[in-house]
Amino acid sequence: GMLSQFGALFTDLSVFDNVAFPMREQTDLDEETIRDLVLMKLNAVGLRGAAHLMPSEISGGMARRVALARAIALDPALIMYDEPFAGLDPISLGVTANLIRKLNDALHSTSVIVTHDVVETFEIADYVYMINAGRVAAEGSPEELCRSEEPFVKQFINALPDGPVRFHYPANSIEACFGGEER
């Protein structure tokens, strides 16, 4: 399954039909079985009552949960998440993080989460790979990474402004700029 950053719901399909889509496209299940499975998946993400709504009628957090229900529609062994917490309010963010962990445990699946949200990821992850400049910069349990003395890891986890990842884009000195040398 795959949950993209903005959910990628089909705007012309209802919540129900968005979740049913992979079942209809990739299985030979009858409509009654699909109905039951879709309602179970929507119930798992707290949206069974929203089955009849269109994507334009639900919030961004709800849309993300519909996309999550669609991602688990076929009970995949691997679920990939692209920035699942981006743009969510604090309540939706917490709910989504808890749902990812609970569904992962219930389905006995493996999740790959690409994100910059350290706190939420560390709360639900068993093992983390940190990527910097296209390479694995560090790996380990959240606890191990929190104890890391590696400068990149320390800066990223603690949201520090100073470290190997520069905040300022390279430029001439500020003195040169105000001295009239730079435009």
Q: Where do the PLM segments sit?
A:
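A short, surface-exposed alpha-helical micro-motif characterized by mixed small hydrophobic
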Residues: T121-E123
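Conserved ABC ATPase "signature" region
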Residues: E31-G49
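Conserved ABC ATPase signature
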Residues: M54-I58, M62
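ABC ATPase "signature
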Residues: E139-G140
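Catalytic Walker B motif of ABC-type/P-loop ATPase nucleotide-binding domains
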Residues: I79-D82
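Conserved catalytic motifs of ABC-family nucleotide-binding domains
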Residues: D75
